[in-house]
Structure formats: C-alpha cells, structure tokens
C-alpha cells in the first residue's frame, strides 16, 4: 500500500461518512479515485505513542477490572465509537476486563492506532465545500484576471481551476482575484 497523504487535524464521523478539514483537504488527492481503491487509516489516539497507549489501556482495564469490556472505554473514546472499536478488537463485549490478555490488548491497541475506513465515493457535488476544475489559469492574465482568449471577459473566484486546502485559502483566492478583476474593469 502507498500513502497518498499524511495529515494531522480534525475529523468528523457523520451520518454519511467522514468529513472535517482533514478529510476535505485529503479529498483533493483522491479526485480521480476508483471506488474501493482508497482506505483512510486513522490514529484515534494521536497524542499517545503506542507504548503510552498500552500503559493507558493497562491502567483503564485495571480500574475497570470487574466491568464488562464494552463498559470500560468511556474515558478513552466517544460513546458512539465504543461499539465499533469493541467489534473490531474481537474482544467479546461482555468479557470482564480482568480477563483480557496481552494479545487481546495488542489487537485493541492496533485498532486504536490504525483504525481503517474504506472510501467508497464522494458526497454529491451539491454538498461540496470546494470544487476543482474551471477555467484554466493559463488562459487568464494574472494581473488583471482578463481572459487571454476573449478580451473584456474577466474571471474571479471558484470559476477558476484553483483549489486550496481548508483554512480560508479559497476565500483569499476569491477576494484577491475579485479585487484584481474589479480594479481592471
């Protein structure tokens, strides 16, 4: 497997899939994707090294030693993630924490540090935050934003084939190109 993009940032699990700044930025690298070709691997505990996470798991399992495994992860994960992580770990939900083996803990740690999600497609264009494509910047005078092909025709913003990562960059492109076009009309 080849890593196309590695990033750190915020991510949302939604009713339709993954979203948030990290996913929006990564999607630009997958625009020509074939369904099922990409897998996103998430580190659900990026602030912890594997060793630190193992120590945390040991501490939490000891603290909850008489509880069912599925009821012991509420300080580690959001409530809605717990059943998914439990299922992927292969540890029976009703297993008591004090019976979980080192091998089971290693599988759990791997699930937390390498949580995979297969990307099956993009959300519809109607829900897009940023789109790629448009008028080629090679066909536009960058000082005036006037078309090199049709005098008197000006372009600004998302009509241009320019896209950027989230964080206001697309707004800056829109403002700057709009200003340049407006100043040269």
Residue ranges and their predicted role:
Residues 1, 5-99:
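An anion/pyrophosphate-binding glycine-rich loop and adjacent beta-alpha core
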Residues 19-22, 135-136, 159, 166-170:
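Gly/Ser/Thr-rich beta-alpha loop segments that engage phosphate groups in nucleotides
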Residues 23-24, 106-109, 113, 175-183:
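Predominant activation on well-ordered alpha-helical scaffold segments within soluble catalytic domains
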Residues 26-29, 142-143, 177:
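N-terminal low-complexity, intrinsically disordered patches enriched in charged
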Residues 32, 39-41, 68-76, 81, ...:
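Domain-scale detector for complete catalytic domains at protein termini or as standalone homologs
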Residues 83-163:
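A glycine-rich dinucleotide-binding beta-alpha-beta segment and adjacent secondary-structure elements
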Residues 161-185:
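A conserved FAD-binding loop/helix module that cradles the flavin
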């Amino acid at each position: 497997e080849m890593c196309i993009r590695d990033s750190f940032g915020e991510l949302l699990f939604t009713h339709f899939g993954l979203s948030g700044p990290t996913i929006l930025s990564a999607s630009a690298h997958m625009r020509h994707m074939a369904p099922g070709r990409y897998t996103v691997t998430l580190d659900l505990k990026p602030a912890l090294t594997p060793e630190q996470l193992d120590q945390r798991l040991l501490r939490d399992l000891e603290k909850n030693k008489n509880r069912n495994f599925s009821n012991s992860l509420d300080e580690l994960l959001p409530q809605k993630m717990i059943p998914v992580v439990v299922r992927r770990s292969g540890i029976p939900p009703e297993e008591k924490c004090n019976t979980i083996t080192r091998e089971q803990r290693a599988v759990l740690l791997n699930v937390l540090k390498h949580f995979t999600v297969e990307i099956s497609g993009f959300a519809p264009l109607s829900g897009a935050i940023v789109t790629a494509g448009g008028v080629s910047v090679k066909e536009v005078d960058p000082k005036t934003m006037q078309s090199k092909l049709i005098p008197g025709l000006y372009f600004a913003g998302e009509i241009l084939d320019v896209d950027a990562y989230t964080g206001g960059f697309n707004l800056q492109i829109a403002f700057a190109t709009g200003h340049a076009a407006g100043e040269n009309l």
